[in-house]
Amino acid sequence: MYVKNINLLNYRNYKKLSVELTENVNVFVGDNAQGKTNILESVYYCAFAKSHRTSKDKELINWENSTAYISLLIGKNRLDKKIDINILRDGKKAIKVNNIKVNKIGELFGIFNVVMFSPEDLKVIKEAPSLRRRLLDMELSQVNPNYYFNLVQYNKVLGERNILLKSRSFSEDILDVYDIQLSKYADYIISKRLEYINKINFYGDIIHREITSGKEEINFKYNCTVNLENGKFKDNYLKKLKDNIQKDREKGLTSVGPHRDDFSVFINNIDTKIFGSQGQQRTSILTMKFASLKIIREITGEYPVLLLDDVLSELDLNRKKYILRSIKDIQTIITCAGIEDLNDYLDDKVKIFNVSNGQILNQGRNI
């Protein structure tokens, strides 16, 4: 899978952009605040219909205009697919795939797969569980539309249950109806998350040993708010919901379920969130991202597009070497301030684009 070309109109600081990419490595070079990341963001947006940087779509629209437009031509399984997205200031968006309207966001997932690695990803390891859940949900949704459906339904029922809890006066028979629905969707979500974590562990073990020259072992552990040991998740979840009714009533929210789960990362049996160095935390997220590349290829038969947003300068030599060795069969779009650190690792298949003030100064030159 690869992006053949990108077309933008009134997208952030790009009034108009049309750029042809190579199937291999594409490097966008320029100073800060010139628009390099905006290009990666537009590619990411076509996979998920959302930005990795903001939840407010209106921020994507050039301030002098009322709409922004993104168009990608994608090569996938020897066929071309075209994604067109119009973004409006009122928060609405119109999406088409091969000129056919996409009515629901879930219909977009799986059309185009990406994995992004940016400096902000360090927060996944260091900060709130919601960031780790979001990462799992995004990765699973893009390879399994049914996962996204179950997640949407779960959150809908969860919201209705919480409204009922906040009312403080309700029949437990009505609550039972919500609990049965929640357990059905939660069972699917948890099973797919566990499968994904198992795959991350399989590929991650190999990747992490290579990055660290065999000095470290990595392990990802899913932390579930419900007992998983006897294999009867639905029964265990229903019991836990009943046990927590009083607490949930007092707080006006549901205290257990996939929306409260988390995962931990251990290096040599040490929790990296609490005790890991910044280097180990970086390596953990790097391992997870590259394991995701392998998983997506296993499921879809093709590597996704890899987006590297100004991360190479943040990495030591071993990590940098691992990335640049590993991307030879993967279309990769890199942003950086300079190519001095890349010259020794990249070949003549690489295209370099110089970016300045929302413009591409050249249409790709070989390194």
From Swiss-Prot:
Gene Ontology MF annotations: ATP binding; single-stranded DNA binding
List the keywords (alphabetical): ATP-binding, Cytoplasm, DNA damage, DNA repair, DNA replication, DNA-binding, Nucleotide-binding, SOS response
Source organism superkingdom: Bacteria
PROSITE patterns for the chain:
RECF_2
Location relative to the cell: Cytoplasm
Q: Keyword Ubl conjugation, does the record have it?
A: no
Q: Which residues bind ATP?
A: 30-37
Q: Name one GO cellular component term.
A: cytoplasm
SUPFAM superfamilies per the record?
Answer: P-loop containing nucleoside triphosphate hydrolases
One GO biological-process annotation of the entry reads: SOS response
Q: Does the keyword Nucleotide-binding apply?
A: yes
What does the UniProt record say this protein does? The RecF protein is involved in DNA metabolism; it is required for DNA replication and normal SOS inducibility. RecF binds preferentially to single-stranded, linear DNA. It also seems to bind ATP.
The family assignment reads: Belongs to the RecF family.
Name recorded for this polypeptide: DNA replication and repair protein RecF
The organism named in the record is Clostridium beijerinckii (strain ATCC 51743 / NCIMB 8052) (Clostridium acetobutylicum)
